[in-house]
Each structure stands twice: as C-alpha cells, then as structure tokens.
C-alpha cells in the first residue's frame, strides 16, 4: 500500500497530527520525548549535555537510584537473568512475583494482590473484567485515560459524573436499577490537577447504593498518609476501598501495576483478566526493585515528611507569586498558563534557565487551561525549589501570565 496514494479517514487523522507536530517544531516549541542521558539523584538530570533541575518526574520520594533498590535488581538479574520468557499463568511466574504481591498486600492491608505489566493495562483489564454489558460503571470526569478506556472496553453502561462532585454521583447512582451491578472508579490524586478525591463521601455513597469501589492510587502511594500508604491512611480510614489499584513506576522506581483486594477478587482476576493471562511477566529486576522499594518507604519515613514540606513550599510559593495552581494539595502542581502557546513558551523560558518542566495542552486539558504540570519530590532541597520558582516567575511576568 502506497501511503501517498491513500485518501481516507485514517490518513486524515495521521496527517492532522503530523501537521500539528510540524507546526510546533517549526516554532521551536516541541518539548516532548526529550531523551534524558543521566538521572542524578532524582532532583537533577542531564539533557543534551546540560544539567537541569527536574520538575516533571513522578519519583515523588526520590527513590530513583536508591542503593538498596539497585542492589535488589542486580541480585535478581544475577540469579534469574533478564526475563521470565513466559506469561504468569503458565511458566512465567517466579517466587519474586509472589513475594512482591505479598508485600503489596501487606502494605495495602488486603488479603491478596496481583501484578501486571503496566499501570495502564492494569486499569484497562481490571475494569473490563469486573463489569460487562448489563452492568454500570461510574467514572469521575477527570479520571486517567486508562480508566476511561477500561470503561469503554468493558461494554458496561458508562456513566461519567462531574469532577469530585459527590452529589452529582449520588444523582447518577439513584437513576440506576437497584439490582444492577455498579462499579464506581476514581483517581485518588488526579493526575492533571493534583487534587484529592473526597473518599469519605464516596465510600458512604457506595455503601448506600451497594456499589463496588475501585480507587487508582498511581499518584498517592508515598504521597498521601503519614507513612505514605495512600488515600485511606490520608483520611484515617481502613479497608473501605474494595479494589485498590496502583503503579510500580512512579513513587516505586520500577515498572508495572497492581491490584490489591480480597482473596476472591484476586483469584477471579488471576483466571479471567486477559492482560494477566496473555502478557509477559514482570522482569526479575523490576519485580525485585519494586519489592525493595515498598520496604524502603516504611524504613525511611523522613522521605514522606520531606515531600510534604517541599510540596507546601512549592505550592505556597507559586501562589504568592500570582500563579493559579487550581486546587492541588499534592506533589502534582499545575501552573496554569491559559492558551497552548503560553504553556509552550513558559516551558521554553524555564528550560533555557535549566529548569526541566513540561507543558500539558489541549486536548489533554480543556482549551484555555493549558499548563505546566510541575512536580516536586523529596529529592529537592529548599534552595533548588526557590530557584525554580524564581525562574518560572520571571518568565511568567514576561509572558503576561502573571
């Protein structure tokens, strides 16, 4: 097939994106897919020969490069090699996987846990395995794309409720037949805005309407709670979430995703969820690294405490300088710029002063709400955060954002 001779909707979609990317590159405003050549302790990186302060990383507790975690990965490679060469359901399960799942279950205070090859595929396969065409799935309007895709793939009746609007969720639930199976899914920390789901009220509603509750903790592990155990600890609640989802690629410096739940739910997913049955198992190094990372979180509580202090400094300082950071109270800090070109321009000005931030533009966020989605970690020091804020402030004033 000659691409140049094709004239259909597929080519139209392809060329629309190609043209959009080309336009951004022509204006020297393309900052996506930048290769990082060195990770220097989490707070600093080497990009195209320049050392920069990293404010776009999900390594919230600064565990990238942690000696204990690296050592666990190295030992796993020495013992098992670099891959399992099989799916978990058949010949790909190692004792390392079982150990990791036991660690996760203990950390999340559930009976069992199950790991997958990525966080995206975890949401995709779990939601679509739990509900089907005669069921209902309720999703916060700002949930992660993986949740949305899982809802769509499930074939269930897909109902979206206004962002963190529990009254609107109650209204939606009340419209559904009482005997229908219902699953409510929400992020613990919303990845674009940094705000936190109203867990106490959503739990109350799920009990009232006999609905299952699934919470995505991708951005809350290590971030929320006195010891970093997540959304339930943050609100002083225990075992109120039926299905606890998380990733192994943000606070945990590895790759993969997990579900922590009851023994029955995990047994069901182990034998039904297609991404578990038909995907390769986590490589030994990644499983061992993730397992050790959970232990480090518990052994080094100062990291969670420092992250909390750094977050307060960063959000407070940006607000004092006149920036709109929406309703965030976590390490994800949106710096609202307005139009897409303003976000690109603020990114360029910041990176020119060695502050590595990245833009988020439409359609990932609504038009007119383009932003820098900055993140702060436990690896940052106070003076580094102050410098970053000063750089963004200077650029923001020149661009008329503040």
Which positions does each model-derived feature cover?
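PLP-dependent enzyme catalytic core of the Aspartate aminotransferase-like
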Residues: 71, 75, 79, 102, ...
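Conserved PLP-anchoring active-site segment centered on the Schiff-base-forming lysine
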Residues: 126-145
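Conserved N-terminal alpha-helix of the aminotransferase class I/II PLP-enzyme fold
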Residues: 71, 75-118
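Active-site phosphate-binding strand-loop segment of PLP-dependent enzymes
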Residues: 159, 163-215
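Active-site C-terminal subdomain of aminotransferase-like
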Residues: 209-212, 219, 224-329, 342
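N-terminal "arm"/small-domain region of PLP-dependent enzymes with the aminotransferase-like
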Residues: 16-80, 211
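Conserved PLP-binding catalytic core of the aspartate aminotransferase-like
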Residues: 304-314, 319-354, 364, 369, ...
